[in-house]
């Protein structure tokens, strides 16, 4: 059986490489995308084992809320809506906004199962990944 697949969506190449290395060490395959449109196209074309077990996306890419828009698009597709989503962002340090979820309702509004501020602690990140995509 193939390793679980995680789609990584972030316009920061260094962060993509770091996330991919952490996930590979934890026993996951990854596909990386530097923009949400490319990830949505790949999701639309994916079938079976090409569908990810988990999606990790940045919040701020081409626009401040690109990650929210991407997550909303994933949730609107019946084929994809049950794929767990983790949003990671430097929005707090870069823009001063606090998007940390305090309740399950906050996460539901984000269309995500988890939210992490960057920099992400690898242990906390992997614990959540293993919870959502064992």
Residue ranges and their predicted role:
Residues 32-54:
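Acidic, metal-coordinating helix/loop segments flanking the phosphotransfer/catalytic sites
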Residues 13-31, 110:
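Two-component/phosphorelay signaling modules centered on CheY-like receiver
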Residues 16, 62-64:
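The feature encodes the CheY-like receiver
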Residues 58-59, 89:
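Active-site residues of response regulator receiver
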Residues 65-69, 91-116, 123, 127:
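Alpha4 helix (beta4-alpha4-beta5 surface) of REC/receiver domains from two-component response regulators
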Residues 10-11, 58, 118:
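Acidic di-acidic motifs
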Residues 50-53, 79-86:
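His-Asp phosphorelay/catalytic-motif detector in bacterial-type signaling
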Residues 41, 66-81, 102:
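Short amphipathic alpha-helix used as the core "switch/output" element in two-component signaling
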